[in-house]
C-alpha cells in the first residue's frame, strides 16, 4: 500500500487561529456553528441509548442475566457517542460492497476504481485548513479505508513533521496514533486523525475552537485540561496533536479487573477533576461529557502486587496526576444548549426531564465518577429514562415534586410520583442491584463518610441546590490536599474565554 504523500505546511502562527480562519471561509453560506453543532449533538444524543457500547439488553423475563457490573470495553483512545452504524452510513451500501470486492482483487483496475471512489467522496466534503490547499486535490498515494479512516503505516510522515510510531486506539471518530514531532525536538505526541467524514470533521472543528481558547487562557497548562499542540487538515482528515498521556481512568480500572482505587487515590483524582472543571465553569464553559473514559492519567505506569486472598495480581498506579480530555461536546454559556447531553450513566436528572441544564450537570457527572472510582462499577447502569429515574429514587430518595411539576416528561409520572412497577423484570432488577447510597460504604472510617457526604451533595436532584465546584474544593474530604488559603483562587477568572 503506498504511503501518505508528504507536504510541507506553514507554521500555525502564520495561518491564524482556527476561529479566525473558520469565519473567513468563502464557501457557500451555511448555518452558524452554534446552531449546526447543537443540532448535530441533539441528533447524536437522541440516538445514543440504542447503540452506546455499554448498553444492556432490553427488558426480558430473565433478570438474572442482566448483570449490573458487565461493562463492555471499546479499546480506543477515548469513548465517544457515535455508533459504528452511523459512521458506515456515510457511504452507500453499493459503495462499501464494491470497495471490499476491489480490495480483495488488488489489481490495477481496482486501484483506478478506488481513486474514482475517493474523488466521489471528496466532492461531498469540504477541506478546511488554509495549509491544506493540497487536500482539495487528494494525492494518488493517499488512501482511506471503507469507513473513512486514513490508511497509514508505521514510519509514515505527515506534514514532513509527524513520524508515526504506533496506533494508540481506534473509535468511530477516527484513530489516535503515537508520533514523533520532529519540529518539537523529537517530542512524543498523540495525534488524533479524524475520519474523512463531514460530521466527524465538524465535531473536530468545534473541539479545536474550544482547545484554542483554553490554550489562550491557560498557556502554561496549569488547570489540568489536555494541551493541544497543533492542528491541521491532511487530505480531508482533521488532525489534532496533543500531549501524550497514559491510559484513561476507566481503562486502568478495567485492566485491573474493576478493582476500586484506594481512597487516597480517589481523593487526589477527584480534587484534580474538580479543579479542572471549575476552571471551565469559571470561564463560562460546560464540558457536558465527563466520564472516566475522558479522564486520563498523565502516566499510567503501575506497581504489581499479588493478592493471596483473591489469588490474582493487582495493579496500583504510581502517579494519580490526571488530565481532562474530549472537548468535542463542550458548550459555552452563550451557545445554544441542545436538549440531551452527557453519556447516559453520568446524565443529570434535569437533562433526563428536559428542564434545561448548565454547569451543575457537570457536577452531577463528577459525583457519579467519584463513586465509580470508589466501588469499581457504575452507579446508574441503565439505558432507559424511566429505569434511570427509578434507580435514582432507590439510591437517593424521591424526585422532588417541584421538578415533577415542571417537567414536560409527564409520561414518567402518575399523580405526582414516578410511574414504576417493582413487580416487573425491570423493577426486580433495580430492587436487587440498587440500594441507598450510604450502604455502598466499604469502611466506617471518617474519610469514607466525608467522601460520601461530598458525593451526596454532588448528586442533589435540584441543580440550584447542588454543590458548586468552588464549594467542593473546600469540602473536608479535600482538607489534606489544600495548599492555598480558602479564598485564594488558583487562576484569574476575570477574563472570559467564551467569545
From Swiss-Prot:
Residues 8-23, 47-65 have a biased composition (Basic and acidic residues). The modification Phosphotyrosine is found at residues 99, 152. Signal peptide: none annotated. It catalyses: L-seryl-[protein] + ATP = O-phospho-L-seryl-[protein] + ADP + H(+); L-threonyl-[protein] + ATP = O-phospho-L-threonyl-[protein] + ADP + H(+); L-tyrosyl-[protein] + ATP = O-phospho-L-tyrosyl-[protein] + ADP + H(+). It is found in: Nucleus; Nucleus speckle. The active site is at residue 289. Pfam families: Pkinase (PF00069). PROSITE patterns: PROTEIN_KINASE_ATP (PS00107), PROTEIN_KINASE_DOM (PS50011), PROTEIN_KINASE_ST (PS00108). GO terms for biological process: negative regulation of gluconeogenesis; protein autophosphorylation; protein phosphorylation; regulation of RNA splicing; response to ionizing radiation; response to retinoic acid. GO terms for cellular component: nuclear speck; nucleus. Keywords: ATP-binding, Kinase, Nucleotide-binding, Nucleus, Phosphoprotein, Serine/threonine-protein kinase, Transferase, Tyrosine-protein kinase. Residues 24-33, 112-127 have a biased composition (Basic residues). CDD domains: PKc_CLK2. Residues 163-479 form the Protein kinase domain. Interacts with RBMX and UBL5. Interacts with AKT1. This is Dual specificity protein kinase CLK2. The lineage of its organism: Eukaryota, Metazoa, Chordata, Craniata, Vertebrata.
Amino acid at each position: 500500500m503506498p504511503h501518505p504523500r508528504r507536504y510541507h505546511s506553514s507554521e500555525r502562527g502564520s495561518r491564524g487561529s482556527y476561529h479566525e480562519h473558520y469565519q473567513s471561509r468563502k464557501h457557500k453560506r451555511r448555518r452558524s456553528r452554534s446552531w449546526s453543532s447543537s443540532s448535530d449533538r441533539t441528533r447524536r444524543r437522541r440516538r445514543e441509548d440504542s447503540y452506546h457500547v455499554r448498553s444492556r439488553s432490553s427488558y426480558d423475563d430473565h433478570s438474572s442475566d442482566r448483570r449490573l457490573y458487565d461493562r463492555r470495553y471499546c479499546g480506543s483512545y477515548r469513548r465517544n457517542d457515535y455508533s459504528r452504524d452511523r459512521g458506515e452510513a456515510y457511504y452507500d451500501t453499493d459503495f462499501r460492497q464494491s470497495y471490499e470486492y476491489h480490495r480483495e482483487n488488488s489489481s490495477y483496475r481496482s486501484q483506478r476504481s478506488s481513486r474514482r471512489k475517493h474523488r466521489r467522496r471528496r466532492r461531498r466534503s469540504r477541506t478546511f485548513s488554509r495549509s491544506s490547499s493540497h487536500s482539495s486535490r487528494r494525492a494518488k498515494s493517499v488512501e482511506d479505508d471503507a469507513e473513512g479512516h486514513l490508511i497509514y503505516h508505521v514510519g509514515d510522515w505527515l506534514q514532513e513533521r509527524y513520524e508515526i510510531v504506533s496506533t494508540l486506539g481506534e473509535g468511530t471518530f477516527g484513530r489516535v496514533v503515537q508520533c514523533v514531532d520532529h519540529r518539537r525536538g523529537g517530542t512524543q505526541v498523540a495525534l488524533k486523525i479524524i475520519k474523512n467524514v463531514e460530521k466527524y470533521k465538524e465535531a473536530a472543528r468545534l473541539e479545536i475552537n474550544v482547545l484554542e481558547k483554553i490554550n489562550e487562557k491557560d498557556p502554561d497548562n496549569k488547570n489540568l485540561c489536555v494541551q493541544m499542540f497543533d492542528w491541521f487538515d491532511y487530505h480531508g482528515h482533521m488532525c489534532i496533536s496533543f500531549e501524550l498521556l497514559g491510559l484513561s481512568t476507566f481503562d486502568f480500572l478495567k485492566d485491573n479487573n474493576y478493582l476500586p482505587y484506594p481512597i487516597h487515590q480517589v481523593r487526589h483524582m477527584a480534587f484534580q477533576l474538580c479543579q479542572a472543571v471549575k476552571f471551565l465553569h469559571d470561564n463560562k464553559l460546560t464540558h457536558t461529557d465527563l466520564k472516566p473514559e475522558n479522564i486520563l492519567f498523565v502516566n499510567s505506569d503501575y506497581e504489581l502486587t499479588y493478592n493471596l486472598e483473591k489469588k490474582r495480581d493487582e495493579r496500583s498506579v504510581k502517579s494519580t496526576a490526571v488530565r481532562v480530555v474530549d472537548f468535542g461536546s463542550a458548550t459555552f454559556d452563550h451557545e445554544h444548549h441542545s436538549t440531551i447531553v452527557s453519556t447516559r450513566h453520568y446524565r443529570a436528572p434535569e437533562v433526563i426531564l428536559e428542564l434545561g441544564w448548565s454547569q451543575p450537570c457537570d457536577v452531577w457527572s463528577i459525583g457519579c465518577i467519584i463513586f465509580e472510582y470508589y466501588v469499581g462499577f457504575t452507579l446508574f447502569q441503565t439505558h432507559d429514562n424511566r429505569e434511570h429515574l427509578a434507580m435514582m429514587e432507590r439510591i437517593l430518595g424521591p424526585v422532588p415534586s417541584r421538578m415533577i411539576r415542571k417537567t414536560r416528561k409527564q409520561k414518567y409520572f402518575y399523580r405526582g410520583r414516578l410511574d414504576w412497577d417493582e413487580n416487573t423484570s425491570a423493577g426486580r432488577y433495580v430492587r436487587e442491584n440498587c440500594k441507598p447510597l450510604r450502604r455502598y460504604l466499604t469502611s466506617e472510617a471518617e474519610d469514607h463518610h466525608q467522601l460520601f457526604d461530598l458525593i451526596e451533595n454532588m448528586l442533589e436532584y435540584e441543580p440550584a441546590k447542588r454543590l458548586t465546584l468552588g464549594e467542593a474544593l473546600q469540602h473536608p474530604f479535600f482538607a489534606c490536599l489544600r495548599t492555598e488559603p480558602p479564598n485564594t483562587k488558583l487562576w484569574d477568572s476575570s477574563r472570559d474565554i467564551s467569545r
